[in-house]
Amino acid sequence: MGAKTPWIQLQKLLNWWVRDQDWNQHVDQLHMLQQKSIWESPLLRAAKENDMCTLKKLQHDQNCDFRQRGALGETALHVAALYDNLDAAIMLMEAAPYLVTESTLCEPFVGQTALHIAVMNQNVNLVRALLARGASASARATGSAFHRSSHNLIYYGEHPLSFAACVGSEEIVRLLIEHGADIRAQDSLGNTVLHILVLQPNKTFACQMYNLLLSYDGGDHLKSLELVPNNQGLTPFKLAGVEGNTVMFQHLMQKRKRIQWSFGPLTSSLYDLTEIDSWGEELSFLELVVSSKKKEARQILEQTPVKELVSLKWKKYGQPYFCLLGALYIFYMVCFTTCCVYRPLKFRDANRTHVRDNTIMEQKSLQEAYVTYQDKIRLVGELVTVIGAVIILLLEIPDIFRVGASRYFGQTVLGGPFHVIIITYASLVLLTMAMRLTNVNGEVVPMSMALVLGWCSVMYFARGFQMLGPFTIMIQKMIFGDLLRFCWLMAMVILGFASAFYIIFQTEDPDNLGEFSDYPTAMFSTFELFLTIIDGPANYRVDLPFMYSVTYATFAIIATLLMLNLFIAMMGDTHWRVAQERDELWRAQVVATTVMLERKMPRFLWPRSGICGCEYGLGDRWFLRVEHHQEQNPYRVLRYVEAFKSSDKEEVQEQLSEKQPSGTETGTLARGSVVLQTPPLSRTTSLSSNSHRGWEILRRNTLGHLNLGLDPGEGDGEEIYQF
């Protein structure tokens, strides 16, 4: 029985993998079976085709079972609702009222009622009929088709209300709420209808429905619907930040903004920092945004007031503390390096036992290591090093459990690789200390590795500077992206050609060609050849095997000409991609660093930013005042442009009238008319003059920019928001 267990587990794993791979095929088969069952059943087919005559006959047929279901566990009422057959649905409800509350029984549509289908199809009349006959407005569909998954093209939640809100039917939303639909209902992920609206691609309808649903959120509950979190602890506002939904974020910020005053082009506004400010919050909005897997989330950092809040925190507290921390770390590494350079060594007592043995000094024992005055000074540095390593671990380990190992080490913006490096460094320092205390030889191994890792961690502090911050991200992406892929290819090539070289020289005298005398040496020599560190290690004073020339020529072409240049091209492409996002990435680094410092620093060294509303009668909330400089209204500029155009027409007409024949003027004078020359409103300069030509270019450029920038729906302000 025990021998069969591994095979059973393997079979389950294979079945799960095959089922996951063939999900689409499985769904296709279900739908084909559904159509087949509908065609074979007279009741289901009549419901599909809206055949009232057949339905009336079946209604009076004693053998007809209105509870019969199709391949997916759907009833005839489900079929009628699916094909928008109102008459058939009403007849079925009259013949079998219990069908109104029946739900689908089979995956992937478990729990789906006819009301769900009618709402999705926006059949208002059918929705009214179902609600009038007792359909539950809070019915829940729990099948896999209603989950947020890569297999599903849409995610509308599990309740009819969320369906109606996502399809944008305001009338159905009002109907459902009037018939008792719970606007606070949550699906299996804990998402309310507001969460689900944030996830919709049609952001205009989502914002409109968001406002409509909030208007029904009464004061019966202590917590607003907007503050209800899902299973991940995300409110709709935080979810908008994680998803990078800038439209919804701006919409919600407009609801929180309070305009203080306007003075010409200047406007002063107060922004509510609830859920935005990371001060004192366990699940920080800023940290969620920078750690999001979606690139669109970084655009949230450009929005007001997030941009201003981060800039305030970074310039006032973050940058000075970060620079101070970097200086302390460099001093710490200098101390550690000095202790390693002057580590306790003594001359070796034993004689050499092998001709290749080149060791002349060895490590002192613990009793001999701390005797002289210089040893005691070194001991102080070693204590500083060990205490620093312990502090590093105490600061890093709690964050691993708080954030999660995969996210903490995997997010580049959060400094993931540097966390691995610094934790490994601290562990190696403690290992070196343990080896020193126990008189175990070989401390040079962890000590040398710790030196390399410790100094590499200095690059982490480059993120405090705009010029160097993206540079570190570029190095990380090249190492963990391009270099890892290249190393796999390089390993395969080296393994193959090293084996070939070893076989070719297996019958030759190793004294004349020792680079391939044994297999490990052949592997290392091939690695050096691959990186062009050495030339072809051949002794041309003796006859070489013919296959060596062929193999070496092939290796040189593949390794040097092809693969190394391919690697350079890959790194160039990575450099170009990172360069396109350098400012965005650096800003995300600054936000992540600011949040990290704010969480670590004592409260008396990092006070809360913003304005407390309690002091000004604004409640127990914090605000940030932002002044906006409004751009000139393009419509006002357009008036001046039109004035320029009209003045030009007057000039042209005037010059044309001056060029008319003199007979016209004499005829006019003969009639006794007196023509008075009035000065034009604009400057009367020649069209061919340089000044007028420059004025013309300036005016046309202004017109061109206005034509590109004008929009009939735009207003005067800097921040324009409309639906």
Swiss-Prot record:
It is found in: Apical cell membrane. Residues 342-378, 402-412, 463-485 are extracellular. Detected in kidney cortex (at protein level). Glycosylated. Residues 643-646, 693-723 are annotated as: Involved in Ca(2+)-dependent inactivation. Residues 1-320, 436-441, 571-723 are cytoplasmic. One of its GO terms (molecular function) is calmodulin binding. The chain crosses the membrane at residues 321-341, 379-401, 413-435, 442-462, 486-506, 550-570. The modification Phosphoserine is found at S682. Disulfide bonds: none annotated. Disruption phenotype: Mutant mice appear grossly normal and are fertile. They display polyuria and increased urinary excretion of Ca(2+), due to defective Ca(2+) reabsorption in the kidney distal convoluted tubules. Likewise, they display increased urinary excretion of phosphate. Besides, their urine has a lower pH. The polyuria and the urine acidification may be a response to the high urinary Ca(2+) levels, preventing the formation of kidney stones. Serum Ca(2+) and phosphate levels are normal, probably due to increased expression of TRPV6 and increased Ca(2+) absorption in the intestine. It comes from the Eukaryota. Keywords: ANK repeat, Calcium, Calcium channel, Calcium transport, Calmodulin-binding, Cell membrane, Ion channel, Ion transport, Membrane, Metal-binding, Phosphoprotein, Repeat, Transmembrane, Transmembrane helix, Transport. Ca(2+) binds at D535. Residues 517-537 dip into the membrane without crossing it. Homotetramer and probably heterotetramer with TRPV6. Interacts with TRPV6. Interacts with S100A10 and probably with the ANAX2-S100A10 heterotetramer. The interaction with S100A10 is required for the trafficking to the plasma membrane. Interacts with calmodulin. Interacts with BSPRY, which results in its inactivation. This is Transient receptor potential cation channel subfamily V member 5. The lineage of its organism: Eukaryota, Metazoa, Chordata, Craniata, Vertebrata.
